[in-house]
Amino acid sequence: MSNLLKDFEVASKNPSLEARQRWRSSVGLVKNRARRFRMISNLDKLAENEKKRCQIQEKIRVVFYVQKAAFQFIDAGARPEYKLTDEVKKAGFYVEADELASMVRNHDTKSLTKIGGPEGIAQKVSVSLAEGVRSSELHIREKIYGENRYTEKPARSFLTFVWEALQDITLIILMVCAVVSIGVGVATEGFPKGMYDGTGILLSIILVVMVTAISDYKQSLQFRDLDREKKKIIIQVTRDGSRQEVSIHDLVVGDVVHLSIGDQVPADGIFISGYNLEIDESSLSGESEPSHVNKEKPFLLSGTKVQNGSAKMLVTTVGMRTEWGKLMDTLSEGGEDETPLQVKLNGVATIIGKIGLGFAVLTFVVLCIRFVVEKATAGSITEWSSEDALTLLDYFAIAVTIIVVAVPEGLPLAVTLSLAFAMKQLMSDRALVRHLAACETMGSSTCICTDKTGTLTTNHMVVNKVWICENIKERQEENFQLNLSEQVKNILIQAIFQNTGSEVVKDKEGKTQILGSPTERAILEFGLLLGGDVDTQRREHKILKIEPFNSDKKKMSVLTSHSGGKVRAFCKGASEIVLKMCEKVVDSNGESVPLSEEKIASISDVIEGFASEALRTLCLVYTDLDEAPRGDLPNGGYTLVAVVGIKDPVRPGVREAVQTCQAAGITVRMVTGDNISTAKAIAKECGILTAGGVAIEGSDFRNLPPHEMRAILPKIQVMARSLPLDKHTLVNNLRKMGEVVAVTGDGTNDAPALHEADIGLAMGIAGTEVAKENADVIIMDDNFATIVNVAKWGRAVYINIQKFVQFQLTVNVVALIINFVSACITGSAPLTAVQLLWVNMIMDTLGALALATEPPNEGLMKRQPIGRTASFITRAMWRNIIGQSIYQLIVLGILNFAGKQILNLNGPDSTIVLNTIIFNSFVFCQVFNEVNSREIEKINVFEGMFKSWVFVAVMTATVGFQVIIVEFLGAFASTVPLSWQHWLLCILIGSVSMILAVGLKCIPVESNRHHDGYELLPSGPSDSA
């Protein structure tokens, strides 16, 4: 099978267009192309979207480079005049929405200057740049200037899915057969008897179509909900005089938005103020170089990303008037990329479908030949009646129905169903799966490279210890007793409040609230405990320049001017890095004294001591300058003020989650920017760093020769002081060694590693929009235990699909062979078209619902990972498929060829009674085998069964409908009511398959590291549900 599937391989992430086109061209037999490829990407649409995107990007380039220059020379009178409408005037505004949109879209600096810059626009939209929009005005602003929402494609109706299900070519052929059968039947047998066969087929087709459409419609609603969740972005704005967080969809014209590294620009707008703002416009214009935005070039476009710096912007245009909104409106949905499992199972379906087509043709040919031979023997070869035509039509319907049963198109669709179910459950468990393949791939992961802060720890940081003036002070509940001189205290408060990117605001109840990163919040809270006041500090100093924190420099700097005209630079960051920038230290009198080698060594010991207690350490430093530097702020000559130790407690349950991963064969590696002592202390507390494990610094790792790096990689459990490039190198090399790597990230610089990994996991709280966009899964609560839950559900998806494949292939084999052999030997098929359609629904839609939606049990995380190279259909599965198929073929074969004698069936209705028994026994074999398929290797198949209400409901419905078909729908399904003895016999024949399953599972099959994920029998421990 593996050799046959060589054309059905795609990369687990970002598959090439050529690979997708190759495997689709390999799918030679497709019953319903629209349905089979509906839940995955539409290659034509993707190509069309790319073409449109390029055209729009080219137009935007023209705007940037031609129109921008042209406006320098165009007379203002030639520009379009925008007349102010009464509605706008009545609302208290003095500028039209289209005028604002045109100004920003065309980068019309002349019009902006004429209006009066950001301040002038603020006046025209009746907003204060300091206070922001008033909440009471939101409704009127949305009414006049629009909402910040893009036009959504209308949801497809249920009838669309019904129509799609009807596109199945084999069902269409059967409908034609049914209509002809009704016509011929009524002509020969009269009304209503002549309608039964054809009407039975039509009713079966309607049932199949409705169940299929309902299943697909529910899936589409789930994906639509998930898509809406993906588009939720929280941004920071100033409203009612305070900084607050709002949804991107609640943004209005006039809002003052705060932007920082990694943010998405949420609407079109104008730069108000900021520092070193660089914007990545590649998603909009295609330009790879970042654009520098400042007061001279103040225009910001929706959909672009903040690559560096920070700023405040005034929103001028929202929703469909923005350039991004127009782009989104132009592009149609292209759908999801295929998951590797979908591709592989499409291959399996195609190969089996071709085999089934061969069997169907052979069955039809054999039945026709036997019929012709019988007529020739009877001497009536030249005499043909409408009854003969009806017989041939029945033969053709049986052949077509064999194709319906033979092509297991439910295989790839079961993957979608299972993934959709898992994605919905994970959503309630605080994990948003952005790409289908991620959930599937996560089940195969062999290692997780995780951040520390916020993922392993709570991200609720507090300053726990501080070193200042050669003394270590520890936090006593909510207070610090530092006993500092006024001069030292003032310098420390300055170093805290001047060098921050966060805000201290009052909430509606008047309580102090700190908005910003957890580290910033901890330091500002420390400053407030010292009695500092943010507003006072901001009034006394003017910020001249900011160099924001990033993962490479591991420090943040700010340049300020005092009221007296002095220029002072403040810096804070990783202790061992910032300490090297210091030449002096503040003494107890607030004076700067030289920093000797001995003192540096002493301070380094303090830092090491803090770190060994799992405290994050930061140095706060400053330096006075004669004048403001033109370029970057200095990297030396600073005076050390204090070393703070920040406590970030380990999350409850993380140690247990790490142990779960280790039991599951998943290696957990911690990759952090903290120093190695802090990293090791946290890693030991979490259970990550074990005996024999290696903790290494990023600088040492990146300088290793290739052969040494390969040798040490399997042992690395902690990487400290790492750069984003180190994380990318680690992930890349682990993948080269055959590992399936999941990696977490929250910063903009983590994007390459998230993109490189098999599964990128972005943090929902601490993560930037750039990180989220490059991730496959967003961990909404930033919790490591949630990551483990994603892995558990990924394994459940993989194993559930294995169960379904085992079940469906068994039905395929038996249905094909029993009808073919019977046709060859007896000249008739025991299973009619209506019966085969019912069997098809049992094994396709209902089987997928029952087996592909089983929730995970704890035992899944006690098994080795599947890995990258495992065969999907394992030896254990083949053993079960072959064993069950042989049993069913033997039993049904005996009934078919000797059933009348064994059961002592006589009389004119003996044949239909026997065929009903065969059909009923066949269905009950599948019912019991579906229960068997809940476990591939474990004997106890009932464990946790009643916790899966979907499975129980499907089993109950299947048995209930089978009783109705046999007892009450005989005219349509070619069955007759059975005696209780015959019912007992059918159930007994089906139940024997469960005893057989126990025996089969005791037959050892060769195992390897990457088996199907189940404990080997009989020694495997029992799972707890």
Swiss-Prot record:
Q: Per UniProt, where does Mg(2+) bind?
A: 746, 750
Q: Which reaction does it catalyse?
A: Ca(2+)(in) + ATP + H2O = Ca(2+)(out) + ADP + phosphate + H(+)
Q: Which Enzyme Commission numbers does its entry carry?
A: 7.2.2.10
The superkingdom listed in its UniProt entry is Eukaryota
List this protein's GO terms for biological process.
defense response to bacterium; monoatomic anion homeostasis; negative regulation of programmed cell death
Q: List where in the cell it is found.
A: Membrane
Q: Which residues lie on this side of the membrane: Cytoplasmic?
A: 1-157, 218-345, 414-801, 853-872, 930-947, 1002-1025
The protein's topology relative to the membrane is: Multi-pass membrane protein
Q: Which residues form the active site?
A: 451 (4-aspartylphosphate intermediate)
Activity regulation, free text:
Activated by calmodulin.
* Protein purpose: This magnesium-dependent enzyme catalyzes the hydrolysis of ATP coupled with the translocation of calcium from the cytosol out of the cell or into organelles.
Q: What is known of its domains?
A: The N-terminus contains an autoinhibitory calmodulin-binding domain, which binds calmodulin in a calcium-dependent fashion.
Protein name stated in the entry? Putative calcium-transporting ATPase 11, plasma membrane-type
Species assigned in the record? Arabidopsis thaliana (Mouse-ear cress)
Which lineage is the organism of this entry classified under, starting from the top rank?
Answer: Eukaryota, Viridiplantae, Streptophyta, Embryophyta, Tracheophyta
